[in-house]
């Protein structure tokens, strides 16, 4: 993975934002943008970053604070003022409780903001407070998940990244994850990185650059391991040209759009119509032409970052009858009906 750090860009960023919270916060926002610019690390709204500092209260006291990205904010456009300040000491005390619900935890996060007008901090805020480094970065890196989301995933991670990495099983983000992280750090206080199975990777450092470069280094190791270990070869069972694919798109797109349109009850705009974005690239066509493409396409996504955008599974049409529009329409109807039923079942 490319290390996007640039001394020139960093200096320009500091010059632009130094006046808000100082140089370190400017660099914190700068490296957050570097992470957000890499879609194989995070997508819009995913991941989170933080830095520990202090807030001066009305009595002139400097109170330890954790400054963390607000939930859902985009790392690619972070500025120093986009970080939410939370009472650091209280966060650590919170993790000493035996159990609280996620709803209670979110309430506690909000009641211990230093500015009540600030947006809600990430659900993973207590984790950032526990980790020893001053700066913390968390991503849902594709290369890491490609290793964790398979049989013997932990073994793959340890082989790729080394035994000094803490590896935790999948735990739903929230209070229980924070408790498990606290226990793991207590057992290995020198650890600077942790992989959460089926979730992502979190690293820390004493400066924004150190933490960022640790993230890039570890993800790069995972990428190298994947390339060296790849043995699966998928033979192509057909070869669809771009010309043929475009012709098929012109046939199928109106049928899909018509079936996705929904009545609104508004006589001026009777239908809520959908616009489709075709993904017609040589790589996509080559993938769909390989043996076993159906099983791969109908595998769940790697991460919640992807899930938000793709949903749990796509609608799939077996052997589309492009030369018979009536049959093709029936195939699409059946596929969409099955998709809706499966998705409703997933929600329930």
What are these regions (language model features)?
Residues 1-348:
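Glycine-rich flexible loops
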């Amino acid at each position: 993975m490319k290390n996007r750090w640039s001394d020139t860009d960093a200096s320009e960023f500091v010059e632009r934002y130094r006046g808000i919270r100082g140089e370190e916060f400017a660099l914190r926002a700068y490296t957050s943008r570097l992470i957000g610019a890499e879609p194989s690390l995070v997508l819009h709204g995913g991941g989170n970053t933080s830095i520990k500092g202090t807030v001066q209260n009305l009595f002139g006291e400097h109170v330890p604070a954790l400054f963390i990205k607000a939930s859902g904010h985009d790392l690619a456009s972070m500025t120093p003022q986009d970080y939410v300040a939370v009472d650091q000491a209280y966060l650590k005390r919170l993790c000493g409780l035996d159990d609280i619900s996620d709803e209670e935890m979110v309430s506690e996060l909000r009641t211990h903001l230093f500015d009540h007008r600030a947006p809600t901090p990430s659900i993973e805020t207590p984790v950032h407070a526990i980790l020893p480094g001053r700066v913390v970065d968390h991503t849902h890196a594709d290369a890491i998940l490609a290793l964790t989301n398979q049989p013997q995933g932990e073994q793959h991670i340890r082989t790729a990244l080394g035994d000094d990495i803490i590896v935790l099983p999948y735990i739903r983000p929230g209070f229980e994850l924070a408790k498990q992280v606290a226990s793991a750090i207590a057992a290995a206080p020198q650890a600077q990185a942790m992989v959460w199975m089926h979730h992502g990777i979190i690293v820390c450092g004493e400066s924004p650059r150190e933490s960022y470069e640790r993230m890039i280094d570890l993800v790069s190791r995972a990428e190298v391991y994947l390339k060296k270990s790849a043995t699966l070869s998928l033979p192509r069972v057909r070869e669809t040209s771009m010309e043929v694919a475009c012709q098929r798109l012109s046939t199928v797109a109106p049928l899909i759009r018509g079936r996705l349109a929904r009545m609104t009850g508004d006589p001026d705009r009777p239908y809520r119509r959908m616009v489709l974005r075709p993904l017609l690239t040589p790589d996509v066509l080559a993938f769909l032409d390989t043996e076993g493409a159906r099983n791969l396409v109908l595998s769940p996504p790697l991460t919640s970052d992807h899930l938000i955008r793709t949903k749990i599974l796509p609608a799939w049409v077996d052997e589309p009858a492009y030369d018979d529009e009536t049959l093709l329409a029936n195939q699409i109807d059946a596929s969409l009906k099955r998709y809706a039923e499966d998705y409703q079942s997933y929600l329930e």
